[in-house]
């Protein structure tokens, strides 16, 4: 095992010189700097500068490192523990437990975090819908089991809340194995999620990996690969269907951008690293379904300054089967989840996949919301009185549809005091069909806000002193 020494430290980037007559460590190999008997720092080889000098990225803080310190080559990339024993545990980028639990023995199976994507002939595709219990998602941008989903939105519009709700709903209903990867997000949110999952009994089926905001960029760059390696083991070796949650994929790009200039690369568009597309491709191509098992990936994507043309979110778009776009204007109206029903999309919204009735109701919902969107300019200038009776009816139904797309979340119950609701797809379709067919025209708009199935609307309206006159709505209420 070759040994070198530190010749330069620039923030998270460390240059290490090895003797030229010995074999140099390979790119992506892990190096270990021995600070003291019980303390060491892991570096990852990124570039060869010539004359035996390697440029590396530190996975931990470089405080206390100095020139001349000894560095040893581990002879392999960073490796992390895998298998059933990782469930219910919390790890850092190096696969070290950070939950206060026991460390893994040295002979425990481990896998390197750098791997090739599965071969083309091993891939498989599924057209099975993954029910989430969230009305706006299930109706307008259904998620595919074994597919990739992106939750796009600016700061503070509810990406993490939706991810947490999806973990709550899918992990409890689907009951499979989940891997949660926190990439460069708030430690508080990770802490809340850990205790929530522990309380709800979901933690025993979940492995968690964190490289949060306070970590050096090296850890934030590689932690997504650590989480993915755990998920790949469950898929390839145990043949499981795995859910992989990544919050937030933008921070993966941002960390790469932070170290890119220090590595000596010329910045590309908007100051991002020139290798942005390659890095994103290497990660996303590994998140896929094979003949052995599947990985369903749900990724939160921060949109800087709400600009969807920014290279980081736009590079991610290319890999996704469904996109859920969160809109700040809906947050301002108090509509949660603030999903834009016209901008969000899914490749699965097809009559051959979701069925004819689902497809027709979804397109009618989009049509009525689009028409309302077009009429808003007239309403803001001339008022409602200038609309025809037919247009007034469209506006009234569209507003009810818009409010009915909102929903109370289980994970937000501690803040709102209102219990959450899980709505099956059949119930969602039935509810929107009743609104669009005019069966609930005489109910007040407020009855549709923040409710679960359509029965909740009827109960809420009754509490407001309004009973529907429509026979179909009455029959539902009596049930």
Curated annotation (Swiss-Prot):
Q: Which GO terms describe its molecular function?
A: ATP binding; ATP hydrolysis activity; proton-transporting ATP synthase activity, rotational mechanism
Q: Which UniProt keywords apply?
A: ATP synthesis, ATP-binding, Cell membrane, CF(1), Hydrogen ion transport, Ion transport, Membrane, Nucleotide-binding, Translocase, Transport
One GO term describing the cellular component: proton-transporting ATP synthase complex
Which Pfam families does this UniProt record tie to the protein? ATP-synt_ab (PF00006), ATP-synt_ab_N (PF02874), ATP-synt_VA_C (PF22919)
Key word tRNA-binding present: no
Q: Which cell locations does it reside in?
A: Cell membrane
What is this protein's expression induced by?
By low pH.
Reactions catalysed: ATP + H2O + 4 H(+)(in) = ADP + phosphate + 5 H(+)(out)
User: Is the Metal-binding keyword given for this protein?
Assistant: no
EC number in record: 7.1.2.2
InterPro entries, alphabetized: AAA+_ATPase, ATP-synt_VA_C, ATP_synth_F1_bsu, ATPase_a/bsu_AS, ATPase_alpha/beta_chains, ATPase_F1/V1/A1_a/bsu_N, ATPase_F1/V1/A1_a/bsu_N_sf, ATPase_F1/V1/A1_a/bsu_nucl-bd
Classify the protein's membrane topology as the record does. Answer: Peripheral membrane protein
Q: Which SMART domains match?
A: AAA
**What residues bind ATP, as annotated?**
153-160
What modulates its activity? Increases 2-fold following exposure to low pH.
How does the annotation summarize its subunit structure? Answer: F-type ATPases have 2 components, CF(1) - the catalytic core - and CF(0) - the membrane proton channel. CF(1) has five subunits: alpha(3), beta(3), gamma(1), delta(1), epsilon(1). CF(0) has three main subunits: a(1), b(2) and c(9-12). The alpha and beta chains form an alternating ring which encloses part of the gamma chain. CF(1) is attached to CF(0) by a central stalk formed by the gamma and epsilon chains, while a peripheral stalk is formed by the delta and b chains.
Protein role: Produces ATP from ADP in the presence of a proton gradient across the membrane. The catalytic sites are hosted primarily by the beta subunits.
Classification via PANTHER family: ATP SYNTHASE, ATP SYNTHASE SUBUNIT BETA, MITOCHONDRIAL
Record-given protein name: ATP synthase subunit beta
Species:
Lactobacillus acidophilus (strain ATCC 700396 / NCK56 / N2 / NCFM)
**Protein's gene:** atpD
């Amino acid at each position: 095992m070759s040994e070198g020494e530190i010749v330069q430290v620039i923030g998270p980037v460390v240059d290490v010189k090895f003797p030229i007559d010995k074999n140099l460590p390979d790119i992506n190999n892990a190096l270990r700097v021995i600070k003291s008997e019980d303390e060491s720092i892991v570096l990852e080889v990124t570039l060869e500068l010539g004359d035996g000098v390697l440029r590396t990225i530190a996975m931990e803080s470089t405080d206390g490192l100095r020139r001349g310190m000894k560095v040893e080559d581990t002879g392999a990339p960073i490796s992390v523990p895998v298998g059933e024993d990782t469930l219910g545990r919390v790890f850092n980028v190096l696969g070290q437990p950070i939950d206060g639990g026991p460390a893994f023995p040295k002979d425990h199976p481990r896998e390197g975090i750098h791997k090739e994507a599965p071969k083309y002939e091993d891939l498989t595709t599924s057209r099975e819908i993954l029910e989430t219990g969230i009305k706006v998602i299930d109706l307008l941008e259904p998620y595919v089991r074994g597919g990739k989903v992106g939750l796009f939105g600016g700061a503070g519009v509810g990406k993490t809340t939706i991810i947490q709700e999806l973990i709550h709903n899918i992990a409890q209903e689907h009951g499979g194995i989940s891997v949660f990867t926190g990439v460069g997000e708030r430690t508080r949110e990770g802490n809340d999620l850990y205790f929530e999952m522990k309380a709800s009994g979901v933690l025993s089926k979940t492995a968690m990996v964190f490289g949060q905001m306070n970590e050096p960029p090296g850890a934030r760059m590689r932690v997504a690969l650590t989480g993915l390696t755990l998920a790949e083991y469950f898929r390839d070796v145990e043949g499981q269907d795995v859910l992989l949650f990544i919050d937030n994929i933008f921070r993966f790009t941002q960390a790469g951008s932070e170290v890119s200039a220090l590595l000596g690369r010329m910045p590309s568009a908007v100051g991002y690293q020139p290798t942005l597309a390659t890095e994103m491709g290497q990660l996303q191509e590994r998140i896929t379904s094979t003949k052995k098992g599947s990985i369903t990936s749900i990724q939160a994507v921060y949109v800087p300054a709400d600009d969807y043309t920014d290279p980081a979110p736009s590079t991610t778009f290319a890999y996704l089967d469904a996109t859920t776009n969160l809109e700040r204007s809906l947050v301002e109206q108090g509509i949660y989840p603030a999903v834009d029903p016209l901008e969000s999309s899914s490749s699965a919204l097809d009559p051959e996949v979701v069925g004819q009735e689902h497809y027709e109701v979804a397109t009618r919902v989009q049509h009525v919301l689009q028409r309302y969107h077009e009429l808003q300019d007239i309403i803001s200038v001339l008022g409602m009185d200038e609309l025809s009776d037919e247009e007034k009816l469209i506006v009234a139904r569209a507003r009810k549809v818009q409010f009915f797309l909102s929903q109370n979340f289980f994970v937000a119950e501690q803040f709102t005091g209102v219990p959450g609701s899980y709505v099956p797809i059949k119930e969602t379709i039935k509810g929107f069909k009743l609104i669009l067919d005019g069966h609930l025209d005489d109910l007040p708009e407020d009855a549709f806000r923040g409710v679960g199935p359509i029965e909740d609307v009827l109960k809420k309206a009754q509490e407001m002193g309004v009973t529907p006159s429509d026979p179909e709505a009455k029959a539902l209420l009596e049930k």
